Amino acid sequence: MKTKTDFLKMKEQGEPITMLTAYDYPSAKLAEEAEVDMILVGDSLGMVVLGYDSTVPVTVEDMIHHTKAVRRGAKETFIVTDMPFMSYHVSLQETMMNARRIVQESGAHALKVEGAGEVISTIQYLTNAGIPVVAHLGLTPQSVGVLGGYKVQGKDAESAKKLIEDAKKCEEAGAIALVLECVPMQLAELISEQLTIPTIGIGAGQKVDGQVLVYHDLISYGVNRVPKFVKQYTSVQEEIVRGISQYVTEVKTRQFPEEKHSFTMKEEDRLALYGGKQ
C-alpha cells in the first residue's frame, strides 16, 4: 500500500497520482484491481448512491458505514474519507470526536476537509493528533450555497490570489495533499508549483500532481449528466438496463427460469409426498 511518503516521492519524480471515489465493497475491489493509487470515500455518495440533491444531508454514520465496506474491498489501497457537512465546523473537541470515530471505526487512512479560513486550524489540530488530512479548495460542494452554485472558482486575479494563499496555509497546517476542484488550469499549475505536497485535480487541468474522478461518472453508472471535466471511459448503465429489461421480459413470457436454473428431486420422493397417490 502506498503511503504519504510515496505520494510525496511521486510528486518529486513527476509521476501522476490516480485517485478514484468508491463507496462500497465491489467498487473498492474493482478500483484496487485496476491499481488506483488512492481511494476517496467522498460525501458525494449522498448524491450518487443515496439519491440526495447535495452532499449536505450526509452524516458521520454514513461515512463510517461506507468506508468500512470500502476498506473490506480494498485492503491494500490508501483510503481517504470525507468529513461530512458540519462535522468539523463545531468545537475542536467535537471535531476530534467525529474524526476519531471515522478513523477508528472505519479504517480510513486519512480524512478530507473542505475550505480554508477556520478550517486551517482544524487541519493543524487533527494533524497534531496524528490524523493525516487532505485539504480541498476551489469548488467545495459542502459550501455551494455560499458559493452561488457549482461554479468555477479563482477565475479573476483577486480570488486566484486568495486560493494560492489558502493552499499555502493548508500545507503549512500539515495537510498531506490538496484537492483542487473546478479551478482554471493555469491557477492549478501555479499552486502545484508552489507546494511541496501533491495536488489532486478534478476539473483543474493537467498540470497538477494527480487526478480524481467520481466512480459513477467515470463508468456512466446511474448518472444522467456529468460535469464538463468528466471523461466517461465506459458506459455500464446501458448494459445494466439492457440486462434488467431482458430479465423482465423473460419472466413475463416464462422463458426464465429454464430447467438448467432449477433444482429437481427423484420421482419416487415426489410421489412419497402424497403417499403414492399422485
Curated annotation (Swiss-Prot):
Binds 1 Mg(2+) ion per subunit. One of its GO terms (biological process) is pantothenate biosynthetic process. It is found in: Cytoplasm. It comes from the Bacteria. Pfam families: Pantoate_transf. Catalyzes the reversible reaction in which hydroxymethyl group from 5,10-methylenetetrahydrofolate is transferred onto alpha-ketoisovalerate to form ketopantoate. Belongs to the PanB family. This is 3-methyl-2-oxobutanoate hydroxymethyltransferase. It comes from Bacillus cereus (strain G9842).
